[in-house]
């Protein structure tokens, strides 16, 4: 079972109460690398992602450069919530094909759960350089370690994220690094429903790219 198929089954560990949240709107880039191992298959998954997060209007967008072993592809993933109903759009940019899926879960706010254990603050690189705060987050299916830059008592910016766990006899670990994070949205058209998805059809995804196992990553 591919790692990308496994992760869509994982339960989110994000709680309703939070220690801190990202700004309501931001953009940035994420670089991820992960490994998975099951009875029949093991592999390495790598992604480079341009992301946009809009917590004000309950929507996200991600342009994913994806590699799983020798297989590589490019996807656009848009999540939108309107009138309390969520929809996931995944476009295979090489094939020009769209998959859609209705979402029963609520919009996932990019927040550190209130029950996360604060590990402490430390510096990346030189002492007195870039200061971050680390959190240990324990869930039923996955665990995570997240480091953030604190902006104020309520807001933080993601720096690194590592998630790991086991499901259906498949072990996995994934790390995420955040770069070039800026507040605000420069071009809101990134959240538009992709033109490839204008037909109201729903398909079973051959390659699930759910992001719900993350804490702050998109």
Predicted segments, located by residue:
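Secreted/processed peptides and extracellular or luminal domains of membrane proteins
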Residues: 17-18, 25-28, 59, 94, ...
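Gly/Pro-enriched, hydrophobic low-complexity segments
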Residues: 128-200
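An acidic-aromatic
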Residues: 47-115, 164-172
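N-terminal leader/targeting segments and the immediate start of mature chains
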Residues: 2-59, 69-70, 121-126, 190-218
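Short, intrinsically disordered, charge-biased short linear motifs at domain edges
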Residues: 5-11, 98-100, 180-186
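Sequence contexts marking disulfide-bonded cysteines in secreted/extracellular proteins
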Residues: 19-22, 97-101, 110-112, 155-159, ...
């Amino acid at each position: 079972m591919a790692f990308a198929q496994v992760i869509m089954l994982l339960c989110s560990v994000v709680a309703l109460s939070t220690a801190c949240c990202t700004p309501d709107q931001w953009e940035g880039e994420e670089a991820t690398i992960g490994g998975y191992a099951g009875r029949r298959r093991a592999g390495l998954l790598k992604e480079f992602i341009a992301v946009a997060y809009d917590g004000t209007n309950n929507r996200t967008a991600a342009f994913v450069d994806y590699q799983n072993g020798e297989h590589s592809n490019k996807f656009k993933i848009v999540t939108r919530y309107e009138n309390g109903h969520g929809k996931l759009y995944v476009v295979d940019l090489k094939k020009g094909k769209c998959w859609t899926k209705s979402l029963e879960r609520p919009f996932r706010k990019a927040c550190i759960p209130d029950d996360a254990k604060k590990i402490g603050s430390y510096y990346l690189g030189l002492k007195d350089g870039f200061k971050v705060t680390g959190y240990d987050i324990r869930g039923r299916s996955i665990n995570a370690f997240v480091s953030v830059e604190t902006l104020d008592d309520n807001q933080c910016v993601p720096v690194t994220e590592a998630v790991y766990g086991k499901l259906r006899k498949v072990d996995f670990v994934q790390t995420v690094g955040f770069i070039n994070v800026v507040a605000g949205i420069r071009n809101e058209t990134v959240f538009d429903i992709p033109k490839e998805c204008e037909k109201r059809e729903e398909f079973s995804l051959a390659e699930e790219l759910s992001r719900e196992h993350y804490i702050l990553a998109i």
